[in-house]
Amino acid sequence: MSPTRAQLTRQIIEAGRFLYGRGWSPATSSNYSARLSPGEALLTVSGKHKGQLGEDDVLATDMAGNSLEPGKKPSAETLLHTQLYTWKTEIGAVLHTHSVNATVLSRLILSDSLVFADYELQKAFAGIGTHECQICVPIFDNDQDIARLASRVRPWLDEHPDCVGYLIRGHGLYTWGAAMNDALRQVEAFEFLFDCELKMRALQGR
């Protein structure tokens, strides 16, 4: 049985409190969503503190990113959420966070991707059953034109159907899952790996 709107709204609110508490979604940054139906998603409204979300801070949109609730404005980055739902129908939740580690690492790396290899925690990602693999995380340059940014992201996703998340340079992380708990697990796994990568680089003098 699919979750109700009330249940999905509660999941988004609780995700905000958890992610804010970990320091991964400071102030009004970040945005979260959940699939409501094949053609609709629930998203956080624009400009709200993610540690203080209430039921009125979530709205329904169509898959083109248009608000279905007059008077409520979705996040400017709504298209980056809805394109993930149209990319894979099994995706049920999308989380976009603004942690220090994701922001710094995405600025530090000058190439267009970050590769993790041989970390045991890679098995926390959906579809990964061994540490003996590589996870390629693309890094897209930030762009205030979200439609243009989305048009760069989608071809990469289509060419890499095993992608589990991506970074926007100097901005943050996007990751997803079949349900909200799956997406939260992937955020936590990414943050562990980002922390490891930054510490390794510091120790190696890079």
Curated annotation (Swiss-Prot):
Cofactor note: Binds 1 zinc ion per subunit.
SMART domains cross-referenced by the UniProt entry: Aldolase_II
Gene3D superfamilies: Class II aldolase/adducin N-terminal domain (3.40.225.10)
Annotated positions binding Zn(2+): H96, H98
UniProt KW Transport keyword: no
HAMAP family given in the database record: Salvage_MtnB (MF_01677)
Similarity remark: Belongs to the aldolase class II family. MtnB subfamily.
Listed name of the protein: Methylthioribulose-1-phosphate dehydratase
